[in-house]
Regions:
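Structured mid-domain segments that build the active-site/substrate or prosthetic-cofactor binding neighborhood
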Residues: 172-207, 218, 229-232
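Catalytic or ion-translocation cores adjacent to nucleophile or general acid/base/metal-coordination motifs
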Residues: 10-46, 205-230, 298-313
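Long, charge-rich alpha-helical interaction segments
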Residues: 50, 202-262
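Flexible, glycine/threonine-enriched loop-and-boundary segments that flank and lead into catalytic domains
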Residues: 165-172, 254-311
Length: 313
């Protein structure tokens, strides 16, 4: 299919099996399941207008990832994710729905999206079209802002032997870095509490109850910890403050293991910073990080989320 090579380079693991089917004819279980259930997907009505009801398997898959829907080069936020009767919602729309249910304050829902610069106008156009309907449905006003990932955080692509990958013309290839590269974007948001979520980590209306409940619970834990942290920071301003209860709180509640020779300065350093409260799901073999104890250069042990490729074999 025309332009497939270009699209293939930018694929995500979401469509890896589909691209291999188009390029090599390798029909994995994932491809078979998609084709058998294609009429159940949220994008089927749009795909049907392109390929009809009886298109062969190759043409169907080609028109999902390349020609037609071009999902191989479409950001996940703009993929049609869920269908409710005749209503189809893209992933970014589900964030509007979810935000209205736990992130509204004073009738406003503030949502910040970090997107690729080449897709920014598409996000802006879709949200401008959809937001009035959701505001009417939920009785809120949305305040949407955007930022783009800093290109200086892009990572050099490498071959399997860790040598730099080069394009056909000899130029080096840089790819957008992972989620950690967005910490600068997060730091520029003016807010007391920020709920952080992947663009494609959304569920349907029928299953959203647990999401809303636990998001509120995480915020409650954050506020309770924040209240005690502020109290202890004020206590540390008083000469001769008793350090042992503060150190016990840091180790038992914040899960930060202090060195034996800690003092007031270190306790203040640990407490006087942004607070992160994370909800973890059971690891059942899917890709993604997990919680590990990490010892920093200052000798302080903290709980961190780490990917397997960050851990020395």
């Amino acid at each position: 299919s025309r332009g497939l090579g270009d699209v293939y380079k930018r694929q995500t693991r979401m469509f890896k099996d589909l691209f291999e089917f188009v390029r090599e004819g390798r029909r994995t279980a994932v491809v078979g399941e998609l084709l058998a259930n294609r009429r159940r997907f949220a994008f089927w009505p749009e795909l049907r207008t392109i390929v009809g009801d009886d298109a062969d398997e190759l043409r169907t898959v080609e028109n999902i990832v390349a020609e037609g829907l071009r999902y191989g080069e479409t950001p996940k936020g703009l993929v049609s994710f869920h269908r409710y009767g005749d209503e189809v919602r893209k992933a970014v729309e589900e964030h509007l729905v979810e935000g209205a249910q736990y992130a509204a304050a004073g009738g406003e829902v503030k949502i910040h999206f970090t997107v690729s610069p080449e897709h920014l106008t598409r996000f802006e156009a879709l949200l401008a079209e959809k937001i009035p309907g959701y505001e009417s449905r939920f009785g809120v006003k949305y305040r949407i802002s955007f930022s783009v990932q800093d290109p200086s955080t892009d990572t050099l692509a490498v071959n399997p032997d860790c040598t730099p990958f080069r394009r056909a013309d000899g130029r080096l290839l840089f790819r957008p870095a992972g989620h950690g590269a967005l910490i600068g974007n997060l730091g520029k948001i003016d807010a007391d509490i920020v709920f952080v979520k992947n663009i494609d980590n959304v569920t349907t209306d029928a299953r959203r109850g647990d999401t809303v409940l636990y998001k509120k619970a995480l915020a409650g834990v954050l506020l309770a910890l924040q209240e005690r942290i502020f109290e202890y920071l004020m206590a540390l301003e008083v000469p001769g403050a008793e350090l042992e209860p503060i150190a016990a709180f840091i180790e038992n509640e914040l899960c930060v293991k202090l060195p034996k020779d800690y003092g007031t300065a270190l306790l203040r350093q640990v407490l006087d910073r942004p607070i992160r409260v994370c909800g973890m799901v059971r690891n059942e073999g899917e890709p993604g990080g997990g919680p590990f104890w990490v010892t920093g250069a200052d000798g302080v042990e903290t709980l961190q989320l780490a990917e397997s490729n960050q851990i020395a074999p």
